[in-house]
Amino acid sequence: MVNFDEEVFRAYYEHKIKSFIKEELSNNLIKGNIFEFDIEKFLMHFPDACEVNDLIIERPKEIEEIILDIFKEAYVELFGEDKELEKIQIAFKNPKGCEKLIEEISAEDINKLVKFEGNILQAGKVNALLKKAVYYCNKRIKDENGGFLCKYTYTPCDGRVEIEIDDYFSEGEFIKDMLSPREVKKILENKKVWDKLVEKGKIPRCVDLKENDEVFKENLKEIKFILDEYDSIYVNIQEMEIQQPIDLMKNPEEPARSIRVFLENTPGIYAGRVNVIGRVMKREYRHNIPIYKIYIKSNYIKISESYNKIEVKDILRNEELIETLNELGRKKNIIDILSNYLISQIKGYELVKKAIFLQQIKGAFKFLPDGTPLRRDSHILLITDPGIGKSTMLRRIARLFPQNAYASVTTATGGGLTAIVTREATEIGDGWVVKPGVFVRANEGTACIDELTVDKNVMKYILEAMESQTIHVNKGGINVKLPARCAVLAACNPKRGRFDRNLTVIEQIDIPAPLLSRFDLIFPLMDKPNRKSDEEIAEHILNTHIETATKDYKILGAIDIDGITVDEKLLKYYIIYARSCAYIEENQDLYLGEFDETKLIMPYLTDKAKKMIKKYYLEMRKLGEGDNPIPITARQLEAIIRIAEMHAKARLSDKVEDVDAEVAISIIDDCLKQVAYDPETGTLDLDKIAGTPKSRRDKMDAVLNIIREIVSLRDDGLAPEEEIYEKAMAIGLSEKDVNDALEYLKKAGDIYNPRYGFWGLL
């Protein structure tokens, strides 16, 4: 414990602290009712004041009170008196030496300042906290000058008592609307501020009774201190539970530890990875037993810089690393090589690997005139036979970056994937809390969703997340919009568990059309026996098992690309570099502070690439003229542009050239041919993905027209089923076509079946 003497502290540091505060105030560096005392910045001004940092960590409460007093003095000296000064609070920013993991916060940290990082596991609604209770004596009277006198002694006395609420649980229970003088004294003594207030003359005589104060003793029962709602100070407070991120766990196999945080002066924060600076507090856990729960009291919390931004700063500070990455980017077929290395556990499926690799790089930041961001993420769906390795791919990508997240629909709920508002017991009583799901946790990353088709109820939750990249929750007085700007990498098996070669791919995808159409790329991965590929896969699996059994596995896990050793770390650096900072203009130092990805130079479409994409789009659209099915829509055009941008960034180029457009078109074209091909017409039909192919719609229209024709000629307004079949087969429809059409038209509400063998129009 650092020794502390307030007088000595003030003698050494008061003038320095006041000088620093005045400079900050002159630059208008105050946020609402919070003044952020930036310790790092203070020490840059006064390098010989390192002890201030140590004292803030060891005795945050006492130092906070002193700095608040100094702040008020500095403010008055600069701007004069201001009633709003009473509402000001001090928040410590950038302390050094108190960084901890959540799992490291223990009993020895009680009453000390700590700094830690974590994910918001759940967050309650914002409530009002009585921060400073102001009481006035009911026996004070006004004098002729507008001041106050004691009713019994007629001596000046404003009868005011201020009680700061520091420990919500031990002090809050004594705060009532009305207190007796004895209760006031007991509270102030328990808070250990009695002597200081007596010394300053801020205790009314009826509270600080002397032996000769008979007049007060006689009337003590009549004297009450009434809580003044107008002069008392209330602040926002939010209770949240923050969990240690897996990437910061000493042992990722153990359950992640979490801690309760009470955040003051907050408008409300419900999701994200956050940095917290606060004081470790305790509250009674078992009545009459000295066992306590630990919680954090904080008024400083900040959304953490994403892993992406942190790594960008590391890259920008390392010229040698930048040179290596740029050299890698110039290598021939570098995208194919890194794509295979990214998912090296699986043999083959090069196009799928490339698409997933590009997905991690993301497209360019672009905004509409009203400021609405355009989606830069690519959504990918893998539909695979068993044994292909879809779960392996998803888990590999989920482990790639901290903001990537994995979930399997077999064990997840819709709310667990998006977000839920639920009623739970909290430290301050039962209340509604927001629990962010996988899509929110994967903000700025990739949400890897396995076994997508296991639970159909989950799919309706996923649709909004993919469509708007936000999650809306509105329940229990909580109405928030949570960010879910993530790419989606989903996987499932075909409807019957394995692909049926007698059916088209789209007929075997058990996903609602609105959700299916949100995927930019849909890859059917079939397990087709082939001697050559089977031999390669067997060799690959055997070699992998041999390598992982050796002591030099980590060395063997790296690959050599023309003299450059690429391991997992360098692969991540390359993706981050391509994603964010390959195109930073002249002064890189500008981005070492508050790094903003949206201000980076992003690749632009060259005329050649633009013409190539436009030509492909128009040629495909032309195939859909007349009664032909539509092979492509504007949604696929946007997907092509995104993928072309990703490919250009993967080459570390600031231009989307014809090679990028060619790759993007080939990937989209390959997916369309596998998924949207209609064997009946021999054409690509996007309506197959949307739900009903044109060929099927034409058959249903034909059956409906037949029913209309028959009904118009009959008095009972009903069409016999036999006659419907007879006329339908006459124009080339099969019995199955008619059965399917009747079933669909009935579900759609176009026809009804009043009695067996007859159909009528609705």
UniProtKB/Swiss-Prot annotation:
Note the PROSITE patterns from the entry.
Answer: MCM_1, MCM_2
Instruction: Write out the entry's keywords from A to Z.
Output: ATP-binding, Cell cycle, DNA replication, DNA-binding, Nucleotide-binding, Transcription, Transcription regulation
**Any S-S bridges, and between which cysteines?**
none
Show the InterPro entries listed in the entry.
Answer: MCM, MCM_CS, MCM_dom, MCM_lid, NA-bd_OB-fold, P-loop_NTPase, WH-like_DNA-bd_sf
Claim: Ligase is one of the keywords in the record: no
| Cellular component GO terms, alphabetical | MCM complex
Question: Which GO biological process annotations does it have?
Answer: DNA replication
Which CDD domains does the annotation name? MCM
GO terms, molecular function: ATP binding; single-stranded DNA binding
Give binding positions for ATP: 384-391
Where the record annotates domain MCM, the positions are: 334-542
SUPFAM superfamilies for this protein:
Nucleic acid-binding proteins, P-loop containing nucleoside triphosphate hydrolases
The Swiss-Prot or TrEMBL record describes its family as follows: Belongs to the MCM family.
Question: Know the name of this protein?
Answer: Uncharacterized MCM-type protein MJ0961
